[in-house]
Regions:
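Phosphate/dinucleotide-binding and metal-coordinating scaffold of catalytic cores
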Residues: 1-238
């Protein structure tokens, strides 16, 4: 048995990726029509051809057995923590969810142009109201209870909140907690940024501050870390 996913670019099928049961290196092959398109999505490493691409020499912890073209679409630390929380709510262990399934979980919500089908996990056909304070609190809980997620999210009333943060937080990339939102500057209303929002809304990448367990490789971020990042952003705008 294998896990198979279709890879799409701008609504067009460009190929498929598969991972055989018991193996840890995936195989990718371009769609026959796309192989003749002349659109090079990875010209240096995966030029258009009818060959099957596999990259067993790539770092397994980094690429999870995927070609670099596809691995770049995988969720990072925070996104994976959210997926693990969702798996716990489904009674599954994180290691039962392979790399191709994680691509399918990203589906069409990724930051780049690539999309993966069939989509897995909670999705929304219309925008829903989001309470940022609840997202921050839930992000802290996810990062603080990584070793006991199933018990943490078994409590009554957390399913909807978990679904909300899964819809906005798994695709943004990066190690630290963040979400893709739609914000209305006039009403200050925040909605999911994963689907088309109503008129008056703007799309933003929202970085959470004050989240417990929020870090990359070093110590946990102190409160106000986001303000420091913002200060660096302002400094970068200064022309000397």
């Amino acid at each position: 048995m294998s896990t198979l996913a279709e890879v799409r670019l701008w609504g067009r099928t460009i190929g498929a990726v598969s991972l055989q049961e018991g193996e840890d290196v995936a195989a990718f092959e371009y769609d026959a029509a796309f192989a003749q398109s002349g659109i090079q999505v990875a010209p240096m490493v995966m030029p258009l051809s009818r060959r099957v691409y596999r990259f067993p020499a790539l770092s397994r912890p980094t690429f999870l057995g995927l070609p670099g073209l596809l691995a770049d679409s995988l969720p990072d630390k925070f996104g994976n923590a959210l997926i693990d929380a969702w798996l716990a709510s489904q009674g599954r262990q994180p290691d039962s969810f392979n790399a191709v399934e994680r691509l399918c979980y990203t589906g069409g919500r990724g930051m780049g142009a690539l999309e993966f089908a069939p989509a897995i996990g909670p999705s929304a056909k219309q925008t829903t109201h989001i309470e940022v304070s609840k997202l921050v609190a839930l992000a802290s809980e996810v990062l603080s209870h990584r070793n006991n997620l199933q018990a943490s999210f078994a409590a009554e009333g957390k399913e909807d909140a978990l679904t909300d943060i899964l819809r906005v937080g798994t695709s943004a990339g990066g190690a630290r907690a963040k979400a893709v939102i739609a914000w209305n500057p006039k009403t200050n209303e925040v909605r999911s940024g994963q689907v088309k929002a109503d008129k008056g809304f703007e799309y933003w990448l929202l970085k959470f501050d004050g989240v417990s367990g929020n870090k990359d490789k070093e110590l946990e971020d102190p409160k106000g870390y986001g303000v420091i990042e913002y200060a660096y952003y302002l400094l970068s705008l200064i022309h000397i």
